[in-house]
A protein has these predicted regions:
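A short glycine-leucine-enriched loop at secondary-structure breakpoints
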Residues: 82-86
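Proteins that catalyze or organize thiol-disulfide redox chemistry
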Residues: 1-63, 77-78, 88-90, 95-139
Length: 139
């Protein structure tokens, strides 16, 4: 089955759906390695249908500098309540287990790219949060 909005095998590693059972591993734990952008959405939400694919495209273009996790708020109400999601779409970015940035509502494509670039920069702007470059520099 082809997932809407993903391209190629690499996107599967960068973009995934999560649930209440896997949120901690998919977002909090994963954000210790690289920033994780979390898209809170619902199937009936018109703006979500526009924002989601645009966000997926920007994350894929970041080539591993960030990951994206999607939360269907209808299926994962506990997560939405705990993070006080009042309207959708809502997007949060997590790094080192903490929310570091975010926005509500649909935004323009240029703003989405700027957001992803800003979040990627917090993690070093490279896959692994710049760890490879730091190790190379230390050697």
């Amino acid at each position: 089955m082809l997932e809407l909005g993903t391209t190629g095998g690499a996107a599967g590693d960068l973009i995934k759906d999560t649930s209440e059972a896997t949120f901690m591993a998919d977002v909090i734990d994963a954000s210790n390695e690289v920033p994780v952008i979390v898209d809170f959405w619902a199937p009936w939400c018109g703006p979500c249908k526009t924002l989601g694919p645009a966000l997926e495209k920007a994350v894929t273009e970041a080539r591993g500098a960030v990951k994206m996790v999607k939360v269907n708020v209808d299926e994962n109400q506990m997560i939405a309540q705990q993070l006080r999601i009042q309207s959708i779409p809502t997007v949060y970015a997590f790094f080192r287990g903490q929310p570091v940035d975010g926005f509500q509502g649909a935004i323009a494509g240029s703003e989405i790219k700027a957001f992803v670039d800003r979040v990627a920069a917090q993690g070093g702007g490279a896959p692994g949060g710049g760890l490879d470059e730091a190790v190379t520099a230390a050697e």
